[in-house]
From Swiss-Prot:
This is CASP-like protein 4A2. Glycans are attached at N195, N279. GO terms for cellular component: plasma membrane. The chain crosses the membrane at residues 162-182, 204-224, 241-262, 281-301.
Amino acid sequence: MALEAQPSPSPSPRRSPEAAAGGAGAPGGSAGDADAQARRATSGRPRRRGPQPRRSPPPPFPRTPRPSSAARTGKPVSPPPPPRKKPQFQPPPQPPRAWDPSPPPPPPAPAAPVLVPPPAPAPRPAPAPAPRVPARAVEHDHRVVPDILLRKRPTAVLQRTALVARVAAALLCLAALAVLAADSRKGFALDSYSNYSQLRYSEAVNVIGFVYSVLQFFVLADLMRRNKHLNPRRKGDYFDFFMDQVLAYLLISSSSSATARVGDWIDNWGSDPFPKMANSSIAISFMAFLVFAISALISAYNLFRRDI
């Protein structure tokens, strides 16, 4: 328990020599007056405290140790297990290196600087396409030819080609049937083409091809002269395409059958003027087949083209 420090009484003030002498020379004065004066003189001054000895703090209260859980339960206390150490990686032992008397390899040469090609210039923007002119103009004889006239040029060339093909087909069919018709009572046997069905078939096909080619020739000639078809064009195109195809197939089939029959005749009886003239007619029929095939292509073009 700490003791509070109480203020010590202030010491009495020192008396001056004059006051002391006065006091001594007046013995008859009362002691009470002298004490009262001394209190008044020292009432306004602070009292001085002397040095006090330091007191030591009280000793701490002794603490009794608390019994552990093992002591309370009465079981023996086992020491804590030692901490586990983590395995440290140790590099495998390396065999000792043999002494190499050769000098160390020279340091690699510095790599040559890689030359970076300069960046390619940016591509220029493509120019804007020119406006398309609906009608092409061609300068011819200081005049402007409109687009419709340019479209008529391929048509005129195609019509001339078809006209030439019709003339050639008519002439070839006429020549084939004329040679075959003249092949009568020829050779040592005085044989005739009319005795064989294959040769009669070839003769009939050549007659049909000649008549059809002459008819188509006059139709095309009138179209080129008047620029007008004799029959409606859609139906006329179908008719031309169909007839060209049929006559081409008939010519190739009749010529093939006649060739087989003449070859059999030569194998049995030998060669004489009769089979030679028959072979000539068959060769002309093959040529007529090629012309009709060209005419069939032109007819197909006219049929499937929309601007005619």
